[in-house]
Protein backbone atom coordinates (compact mmCIF):
# COMPACT_ATOMS: atom_id res chain seq x y z
CA UNK A 1 0.00 0.00 0.00
CA UNK A 2 1.20 3.54 -0.81
CA UNK A 3 4.18 2.36 -2.87
CA UNK A 4 5.07 5.96 -3.51
CA UNK A 5 8.83 6.14 -3.06
CA UNK A 6 10.59 2.86 -3.63
CA UNK A 7 14.27 2.44 -4.42
CA UNK A 8 15.49 0.76 -7.63
CA UNK A 9 16.50 -2.24 -5.49
CA UNK A 10 12.99 -2.45 -4.10
CA UNK A 11 11.55 -2.11 -7.60
CA UNK A 12 13.63 -5.13 -8.65
CA UNK A 13 12.42 -7.04 -5.59
CA UNK A 14 8.82 -6.23 -6.49
CA UNK A 15 9.48 -7.89 -9.87
CA UNK A 16 11.35 -10.87 -8.37
CA UNK A 17 8.65 -11.52 -5.79
CA UNK A 18 5.75 -10.68 -8.13
CA UNK A 19 4.47 -7.99 -5.76
CA UNK A 20 1.52 -5.92 -6.93
CA UNK A 21 1.99 -2.38 -5.63
CA UNK A 22 -1.00 -0.29 -4.67
CA UNK A 23 -0.71 3.36 -5.61
CA UNK A 24 -2.91 6.41 -5.50
CA UNK A 25 -2.21 8.81 -8.38
CA UNK A 26 -3.80 11.74 -6.53
CA UNK A 27 -1.01 11.47 -3.95
CA UNK A 28 1.51 12.27 -6.67
CA UNK A 29 -0.22 15.45 -7.73
CA UNK A 30 -0.91 16.48 -4.14
CA UNK A 31 2.66 15.80 -3.08
CA UNK A 32 4.36 17.47 -6.04
CA UNK A 33 4.31 20.83 -4.25
CA UNK A 34 6.57 19.61 -1.44
CA UNK A 35 7.97 16.15 -2.25
CA UNK A 36 11.07 17.35 -4.10
CA UNK A 37 12.10 19.51 -1.13
CA UNK A 38 11.49 16.66 1.31
CA UNK A 39 12.91 13.78 -0.72
CA UNK A 40 15.62 15.56 -2.70
CA UNK A 41 16.34 15.25 -6.41
CA UNK A 42 18.05 11.84 -6.11
CA UNK A 43 15.15 10.17 -4.33
CA UNK A 44 12.41 11.93 -6.28
CA UNK A 45 13.52 10.06 -9.41
CA UNK A 46 12.04 6.90 -7.91
CA UNK A 47 8.91 8.48 -6.47
CA UNK A 48 5.57 7.54 -8.03
CA UNK A 49 7.50 5.44 -10.57
CA UNK A 50 4.48 4.01 -12.32
CA UNK A 51 6.11 3.74 -15.76
CA UNK A 52 9.23 2.03 -14.37
CA UNK A 53 7.13 -0.61 -12.63
CA UNK A 54 4.87 -1.29 -15.60
CA UNK A 55 7.81 -1.43 -17.99
CA UNK A 56 9.31 -4.12 -15.76
CA UNK A 57 6.16 -6.20 -16.20
CA UNK A 58 4.28 -5.32 -13.02
CA UNK A 59 0.68 -4.26 -12.72
CA UNK A 60 -0.43 -1.54 -10.32
CA UNK A 61 -3.61 -1.62 -8.27
CA UNK A 62 -4.91 1.94 -8.21
CA UNK A 63 -6.91 3.42 -5.40
CA UNK A 64 -8.25 6.76 -4.21
CA UNK A 65 -7.27 6.66 -0.53
CA UNK A 66 -10.60 8.29 0.30
CA UNK A 67 -11.37 9.92 2.66
CA UNK A 68 -7.76 11.19 2.88
CA UNK A 69 -8.06 12.17 -0.78
CA UNK A 70 -11.26 13.30 -2.50
CA UNK A 71 -12.02 9.89 -4.00
CA UNK A 72 -13.05 11.23 -7.40
CA UNK A 73 -12.19 8.74 -10.17
CA UNK A 74 -11.69 11.59 -12.65
CA UNK A 75 -8.94 13.06 -10.46
CA UNK A 76 -7.22 9.69 -10.13
CA UNK A 77 -7.40 9.05 -13.88
CA UNK A 78 -6.20 12.59 -14.68
CA UNK A 79 -3.31 12.32 -12.22
CA UNK A 80 -2.22 8.97 -13.65
CA UNK A 81 -2.14 10.20 -17.25
CA UNK A 82 -0.75 13.72 -16.65
CA UNK A 83 1.22 13.82 -13.37
CA UNK A 84 0.01 17.43 -13.13
CA UNK A 85 -1.99 19.04 -10.35
CA UNK A 86 -5.58 20.13 -10.88
CA UNK A 87 -4.40 23.47 -12.27
CA UNK A 88 -2.10 21.81 -14.84
CA UNK A 89 1.09 22.52 -12.87
CA UNK A 90 3.98 20.08 -12.61
CA UNK A 91 7.20 20.68 -10.73
CA UNK A 92 10.61 20.61 -12.35
CA UNK A 93 12.10 17.18 -11.84
CA UNK A 94 8.65 15.64 -11.47
CA UNK A 95 9.36 12.99 -14.11
CA UNK A 96 6.49 13.38 -16.52
CA UNK A 97 7.90 10.31 -18.29
CA UNK A 98 6.42 8.23 -15.45
CA UNK A 99 2.85 8.99 -16.47
CA UNK A 100 0.61 6.23 -17.78
CA UNK A 101 -1.25 5.81 -21.02
CA UNK A 102 -5.00 6.16 -20.71
CA UNK A 103 -5.43 2.45 -21.31
CA UNK A 104 -2.97 1.66 -18.50
CA UNK A 105 -4.75 4.12 -16.20
CA UNK A 106 -8.07 2.44 -16.98
CA UNK A 107 -6.60 -0.96 -16.12
CA UNK A 108 -5.08 0.53 -12.95
CA UNK A 109 -8.62 1.06 -11.64
CA UNK A 110 -10.40 -1.94 -13.15
CA UNK A 111 -8.77 -5.26 -13.94
CA UNK A 112 -5.48 -4.75 -12.08
CA UNK A 113 -7.08 -4.24 -8.62
CA UNK A 114 -9.30 -7.24 -9.34
CA UNK A 115 -6.19 -9.33 -10.03
CA UNK A 116 -4.52 -7.94 -6.90
CA UNK A 117 -7.47 -9.07 -4.78
CA UNK A 118 -7.73 -12.45 -6.55
CA UNK A 119 -11.19 -11.48 -7.82
CA UNK A 120 -10.59 -11.17 -11.56
CA UNK A 121 -13.18 -13.89 -12.24
CA UNK A 122 -15.87 -11.69 -10.68
CA UNK A 123 -14.61 -8.11 -11.15
CA UNK A 124 -12.43 -5.87 -13.26
CA UNK A 125 -14.08 -6.19 -16.66
CA UNK A 126 -17.63 -5.95 -17.95
CA UNK A 127 -18.65 -9.48 -18.84
CA UNK A 128 -21.64 -11.74 -18.37
CA UNK A 129 -21.54 -13.23 -14.88
CA UNK A 130 -19.39 -10.49 -13.34
CA UNK A 131 -20.55 -7.86 -10.84
CA UNK A 132 -20.84 -5.12 -13.48
CA UNK A 133 -19.65 -2.14 -11.45
CA UNK A 134 -19.00 0.83 -13.75
CA UNK A 135 -19.58 4.52 -14.40
CA UNK A 136 -20.34 6.29 -17.64
CA UNK A 137 -19.26 9.87 -18.27
CA UNK A 138 -20.58 12.46 -20.71
CA UNK A 139 -17.14 12.71 -22.33
CA UNK A 140 -14.85 9.97 -23.60
CA UNK A 141 -12.02 9.95 -21.05
CA UNK A 142 -9.93 7.88 -23.44
CA UNK A 143 -9.79 10.53 -26.17
CA UNK A 144 -10.62 14.04 -24.91
CA UNK A 145 -7.80 16.54 -24.31
CA UNK A 146 -6.24 15.90 -20.89
CA UNK A 147 -7.36 19.24 -19.46
CA UNK A 148 -10.99 18.25 -20.20
CA UNK A 149 -10.85 15.01 -18.14
CA UNK A 150 -11.75 16.85 -14.94
CA UNK A 151 -14.76 18.45 -16.67
CA UNK A 152 -16.39 15.11 -17.53
CA UNK A 153 -19.63 14.48 -15.66
CA UNK A 154 -20.82 11.15 -14.37
CA UNK A 155 -24.15 10.34 -16.02
CA UNK A 156 -24.62 6.74 -14.90
CA UNK A 157 -23.21 4.46 -12.20
CA UNK A 158 -24.01 0.77 -11.98
CA UNK A 159 -23.04 -1.37 -8.98
CA UNK A 160 -23.54 -5.12 -9.07
CA UNK A 161 -25.71 -4.76 -12.14
CA UNK A 162 -28.04 -2.17 -10.58
CA UNK A 163 -28.27 1.49 -11.48
CA UNK A 164 -27.34 3.48 -8.36
CA UNK A 165 -26.99 6.88 -10.05
CA UNK A 166 -28.44 8.30 -13.23
CA UNK A 167 -28.40 11.92 -14.32
Predicted regions and their residues:
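Active-site glycine- and acidic-residue-rich loops that bind
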Residues: 1-8
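His/Asp/Glu-enriched, well-ordered alpha-helical/loop segment
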Residues: 8, 12, 16-141, 147, ...
